[in-house]
Amino acid sequence: MARHSVHHQAQRPPRAKNPQEQQRRPMGQTTLPAEQEESRVKCKNCGAFGHSARSKTCPIKRWSGALPLQALGSHKEKENLKPAKAQLPFTTPGPFTTNDREKERSPSPQQQQSEAPTQTFPRTPQEKMQEAWKEPAEDCLFLRHPTMPLPVHTTKKRSVLGPVSTGPPPVNKPEMRLLCPSGHNDSPQLSTCGPTKGHGRDVTASLLPVLKSSHQTPTLSARLPANRPDMSSHGALQPAMQALALGPGLKSQAEIKHPDADAKPRPQQVRKQCGQDSRTQAPDKEPAPVPTQTFQNPAKKARFSSFQTPALRTQLPDVGAVQTLQPPRTATGLGSKEAPKATAETAATKTATLQPRVNLQPAPSSPFLGPAQGCPVLQPGPPIHVPGRPGSVTFMRGDKGQKSPRFRMPPTSRPPENSASAQSPRFSRQPEGQGPQVSTSVLYEDLLVTSSSEDSDSD
């Protein structure tokens, strides 16, 4: 009991000696905060803070009639005997905050009612402008997605124009170009560099209106993609160059001889023929100067390249044919994969190579196709202009055995005249086994004369 009395005496608050001083003190000083009381008061029976040994809350002193412990002060969270009641202050703000957030997100019906009349009022100019801005936005949304069906509609529209390209090539096509040698262009060369789709058609039949309508005499050279990988582009240039040299002086023999469609020219023979048979003239028409070229002299390569480059620059690669160009084996730059070995040329080989052969099938990657190839018939005529060999003289033997000297003028001195080949475009097709009507001895003598004259000019 003494312990309890001592403890109670220490626990009593100090009292003022005078009752007046006790009244003067404020009431807040007598009641200490709960934290200070808890730190000071400690039950000696149970050792818990917050109550004294005399308090009814002490479970040891009054076990049977003890009250349930309650949280006091800052220990409410620690002494959580009733979780439902203890979590109320923390859980209750949750629904209020969520409700507030939902209210902030979704406007109240009063606000909706207040905003609704503003939209139902007559439209102001600003609202009309806003709607005008909304319409292109919808169009943009519509234009974002139909990217896939657009090509379908365009292909269907273009399919109607498809058969136009399968027919004969038009005259006023941007791919049609006029190529001619240096000098004035009186007899241009019509070349279609673009690929045409008529594989099985006759090119000469499709381009006859072009030749009839033109007042000039174009040497026709068309290009067709084919499936024959027999010759390269160098070999395919030979019919075109021969047609260029023989343009006005072609003699039509389609009615006399029926050619073989699969006849192939030998490159060496074509080159020899270009050198010899280029000075040909039609017997029915008046003699006209023809641009001729001889591919015999290797020293004249630099001069001849200026005339050949326009035809080579206009080449366009074929879609279906892929072939590599071989370097030229001769000085003229018209080599071919099928070119024979020209090591030792004898008189027999020269006479054999003078027989002309025409390639009637298009080469796989040939930029030019020479559909017009004539059988040469030598007749005397006016002087012939040869580009690249000014001042040279050639002797030519006619049908009666007469030799007539011919002066070769520079290409800029006098342009070639028009011939009548455009009025009657008949092309002769000759098989591989047939030769010219002129005897080979006459042609061989002409070959020797021209080669000797060229050697003298080069010296």
UniProtKB/Swiss-Prot annotation:
Coiled-coil ranges per UniProt: none
Domain of life per record: Eukaryota
Biased composition (Basic and acidic residues): 125-136
Positions of the UniProt region annotated as Disordered: 1-41, 74-136, 153-239, 259-459
Basic residues: compositionally biased ranges: 1-10
InterPro entries in the record: FAM90, Znf-CCHC_6
Ranges annotated as biased composition (Polar residues): 184-194, 415-427
Start-end of Low complexity biased regions: 341-353
Official protein name in the record: Protein FAM90A27P
Organism field: Homo sapiens (Human)
